[in-house]
Amino acid sequence: MRILAISGSLRDASYNTALLRALREEAPEGVEVDIWQGLKVIPPYDQDEDLVPGPEAVEAFRELVRESDAVFFSTPEYNSSIPGALKNALDWGSRPVATNVFRNKPVAVISASAGAFGGVWAGAELRKVLGAMGARVTEAELAVGHAHEKFTEDGVIEDLDLRQGLSDALQTLVTSVLDRAAAA
């Protein structure tokens, strides 16, 4: 099973990207987690360019989503919402409507921020957007508050409860993929 992991952050030292690295370590046998960090190269959405094929970076992104069995998102919170670069990529992936690569795709959403609430509003907003796009949003939820305190200098998570929360979120997504395959 192939899961595409997308961080909503552009920062090199992103807590959300670090969470996805830890998630990859928690992956059970037979589950491959590929972290995509290409938000920076996706051009601003332009309906005039809303074609198939679209811009090269957009087509590469669409293909990654299309080839994955599921998508796992980890997002920071900016002004009580998701980062613009992430929303931009989602707009490209869901358009044109007839070729929406997220339709019926199982997805999971977690969030992390330096604040006490851990990006909970951004997580809720991302779930809403993904649902409106036709993705199959799982019940997996994890909001990591005070994220800057959760990692060692090497980016390792020592908090066993947090590691378990990541593992649980991943298992929820894996189960969703397996249930979808069994129903087909």
Predicted regions and their residues:
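Glycine-rich phosphate/pyrophosphate-binding loop and the adjoining helix
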Residues: 4, 136-184
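A general structural signal for well-ordered alpha-helical segments in protein cores
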Residues: 3, 16, 20, 58, ...
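Helix-loop-strand module that forms the ligand-binding subsite of alpha/beta enzymes
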Residues: 53-133
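Short beta-strand elements in bilobed, periplasmic/extracellular small-molecule ligand-binding domains
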Residues: 31-44, 137-145
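N-terminal beta1-alpha1 ligand-phosphate binding loop
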Residues: 1-31
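N-terminal beta-loop-helix "entrance" segment that forms/cooperates
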Residues: 38-55, 150-154
